């Protein structure tokens, strides 16, 4: 067996040294043992692009056989080294599903989440990938709470939660900016419930009050009283938290106008 492996290694090395034409022949070859040895050698020599092509070629042939775990692992690792985080994350997640009892499963789960973290865009862009990364890291923390990766996991989670908070505020304020006051009101209310310690909390409270007032004042008559009363309640809840003098003055003005409108409706 050792002699056979030695011969395979020699053959793989010869193929590596004879250039591109022989690499194409290697890809088309049906000698999967030589392909496997060559893939590992390419990986160990940091020729990740060629290793990826060979591992991809080998995956189906070795499914359920000897070397299947090694191929799946190093395929994902080669993609990771090439910074193809989307495909690497997919392969690490697949590895964790296919080899749940492997000693590498914890690392695979971590790297699956980490790849999504690396692909997570700026908060101004769509945050679907960020949410997926958060979910995977939270699942990882539940399953391996004593992992050596936990300091990193907590740091990445904090960073991504800030990003999601900024995105949620941007969306809520965006509704206010385009004068969709009902949507702005609901979004800002949800934001304040979700992020009680947000640094932009004062801004959110102020725009909530303004949105609620503008939505109420433009409502149909049968709904106006109820919505104006809601504005009064919102004022009472937020006024003590407003520190910005401009916000306080405008909030007081909204309150006075709301009270005046309600008094007029009583007549």
Regions found by a protein language model. Give the residues of each.
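Sec-dependent bacterial lipoprotein signal peptides
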Residues: 1-20
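Acidic, polar-rich low-complexity tracts and alpha-helical solenoid repeat scaffolds
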Residues: 4, 19-267
């Amino acid at each position: 067996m050792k002699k056979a492996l030695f011969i395979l290694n020699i053959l793989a090395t010869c193929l590596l040294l004879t250039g591109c034409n022989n690499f194409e022949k290697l890809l088309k070859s049906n000698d999967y043992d030589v392909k496997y040895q060559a893939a590992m050698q390419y990986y160990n020599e940091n020729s990740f692009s060629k290793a990826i092509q060979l591992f991809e070629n080998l995956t189906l042939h070795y499914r359920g056989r000897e070397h299947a775990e090694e191929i799946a692992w190093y395929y994902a690792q080669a993609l990771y080294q090439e910074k193809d985080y989307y495909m690497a994350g997919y392969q690490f997640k697949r590895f964790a599903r296919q080899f749940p009892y492997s000693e590498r499963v914890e690392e695979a789960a971590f790297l699956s989440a980490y790849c999504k973290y690396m692909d997570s865009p700026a908060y101004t862009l769509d945050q679907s990938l960020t949410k997926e990364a958060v979910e995977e890291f939270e699942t990882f923390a539940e399953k391996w709470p004593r992992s050596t990766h936990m300091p990193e996991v907590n740091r990445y989670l904090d960073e991504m939660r800030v990003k999601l908070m900024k995105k949620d505020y941007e969306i809520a304020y965006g509704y206010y900016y385009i004068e969709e006051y009902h949507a702005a009101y609901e979004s800002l209310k949800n934001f304040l419930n979700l992020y009680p310690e947000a640094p932009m909390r004062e801004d959110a409270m102020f725009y909530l009050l303004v949105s609620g007032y503008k939505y109420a004042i433009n409502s149909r008559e049968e709904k106006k009283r109820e919505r104006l009363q809601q504005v009064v309640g919102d004022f009472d809840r937020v006024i003590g938290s407003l520190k910005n003098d401009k916000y306080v003055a405008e909030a007081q003005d909204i309150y006075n106008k709301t009270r005046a409108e309600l008094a007029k409706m009583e007549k």
